[in-house]
Amino acid sequence: MSKVTVYSKPNCPQCTQTKKKLEQKGIAFEVIDISQDKNALQHVLDLGYRQAPAVVSGEKHWSGFRPDLLSAL
């Protein structure tokens, strides 16, 4: 399985739901706070996303809480 990175920010309900779903599935993931890391924020913007969370797993990536895509990991 590819490394999973969740680009998150504080007080983000969809971020919380995404992390909870990954934990329930037993999937290890890294959380990067885009409010504290400007390079990470730029990476998310470069991917074309304006909404948190942005999730990156290998070549796949998406934004928002997407249980359908999380279940496919």
Positions of predicted regions on the chain:
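A short, hydrophobic beta-strand/beta-hairpin element that forms part of a small beta-sheet core
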Residues: 53-63
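Short hydrophobic/aromatic patches at helix-to-coil boundaries
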Residues: 67-73
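Conserved beta-strand positions in the Rossmann-like core of class I SAM-dependent methyltransferases
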Residues: 5, 30-32
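Residue-level detector of anion-binding/catalytic polar loops
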Residues: 28, 50
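Local sequence-structure signature of Cys/Sec-based thiol-disulfide redox active-site neighborhoods
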Residues: 1-25
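ATP/adenylate-binding site constellation spanning eukaryotic-like Ser/Thr protein kinases
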Residues: 9, 49, 67
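Thioredoxin-like thiol-disulfide oxidoreductase module
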Residues: 33-49
